[in-house]
Amino acid sequence: MLILTRRVGETLMIGDDVSVTVLGVKGNQVRIGVNAPKDVSVHREEIYMRIQSEKDDEQDKE
């Protein structure tokens, strides 16, 4: 795992097309902004896991 330190307003790049910007820090919460092409899905981990679980359930029914 790559670990980076960024300050509010600073950005990191993932590949050529995805940027992640630290928008704010309040207590133990960090607000981030993600710019990515429309064909790149961006989800919070818990939402991604739910989507994957629903896909698995669909495949099990087939």
Swiss-Prot record:
Cross-referenced InterPro entries: CsrA (IPR003751), CsrA_sf (IPR036107)
Keywords, ordered alphabetically: Activator, Cytoplasm, Repressor, RNA-binding, Translation regulation
Residues spanning the signal sequence: none
Gene3D superfamilies tied to this protein: Translational regulator CsrA (2.60.40.4380)
Gene Ontology molecular function: mRNA 5'-UTR binding
GO annotation, cellular component aspect: cytosol
Example of a GO biological process term: positive regulation of translational initiation
SUPFAM superfamilies, A to Z: CsrA-like (SSF117130)
Subcellular location: Cytoplasm
A Pfam entry, by short name: CsrA
Similarity annotation: Belongs to the CsrA/RsmA family.
Subunit structure: Homodimer; the beta-strands of each monomer intercalate to form a hydrophobic core, while the alpha-helices form wings that extend away from the core.
Record NCBIfam families: csrA, PRK01712.1
Function according to Swiss-Prot or TrEMBL: A key translational regulator that binds mRNA to regulate translation initiation and/or mRNA stability. Mediates global changes in gene expression, shifting from rapid growth to stress survival by linking envelope stress, the stringent response and the catabolite repression systems. Usually binds in the 5'-UTR; binding at or near the Shine-Dalgarno sequence prevents ribosome-binding, repressing translation, binding elsewhere in the 5'-UTR can activate translation and/or stabilize the mRNA. Its function is antagonized by small RNA(s).
PANTHER family: CARBON STORAGE REGULATOR
UniProt name for this protein: Translational regulator CsrA
Gene encoding the protein: csrA
